[in-house]
């Protein structure tokens, strides 16, 4: 019998064991760009960098669940590095500490290809872009991960575009349209890309529903991204978690696991009474014990 796409991906995904002493942060859909009108992260870059620094300083393992880099609209990863060198340097520190796992989504699926490897191998290692080479040249880029919590609960981590037909089965066509059509229409004429779940509430709900159905059918919790809609269910609800994105107006969302508990986090800019702007970390969901989640 032919396996469904999520079951197939899960069956070949590496399994990582962790316990209540481990701390994990999930972030997806950063869409790091080239600093032009095509760069969706730019307005929230300082918020994202603050979150990333927090996770590094506090010994979290950082799992990026796809669409970290906007490689549909931007052809060359070096152009993204030149816009965000400090972010890449911090990701490299996570890697050197063995605290970095990177998955690909539809917008950076090229990272899992030989074409991307050749792009990295061609980087002049005498230049500053050496950080890009050091980050990517031997970094596994996964389609999925399985996190095993003390043999009590397994979490399947995946971007989520696999259940979104136009962004998975028709990825070359979708990436062409986004790079050469929608990026122009959005940047110059203000049109909204209706093919993306991130921009279409109808498509977002369809993707959420498909992922929830798979979770229930397979008795397997999922942590995903893709839809840009964060969610942390109650323990008596279907355990489909979504870390949201980094490109909502003035905010970034993430999911944290600490001391065996899972939480949904919002990072946003707040103004203090003295007029100083600061980035605030706010728990907006949970914390809930992982072991309390049941399939209904």
Locations of regions flagged by a protein language model:
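Acidic, histidine-bearing metal-coordination/catalytic regions of metal-dependent phosphoesterases
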Residues: 1-23
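Active-site-proximal loop/helix segment associated with metal-binding centers of metalloenzymes
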Residues: 155-209
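Extended, basic/helix-rich recognition subdomains
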Residues: 190-261
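Core catalytic region of metal-dependent phosphoesterases/phosphodiesterases
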Residues: 15-22, 27, 32-145
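Active-site-proximal beta-strand elements of phosphoester/diester hydrolases
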Residues: 23-31, 154-161, 240-244
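Binuclear metal-dependent phosphoesterase catalytic core
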Residues: 148, 238-296
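Active-site glycine-centered loops adjacent to acidic/histidine catalytic or metal-binding residues
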Residues: 29, 67, 105, 159, ...
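Structural motif
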Residues: 23-24, 60-62, 153-155, 221, ...
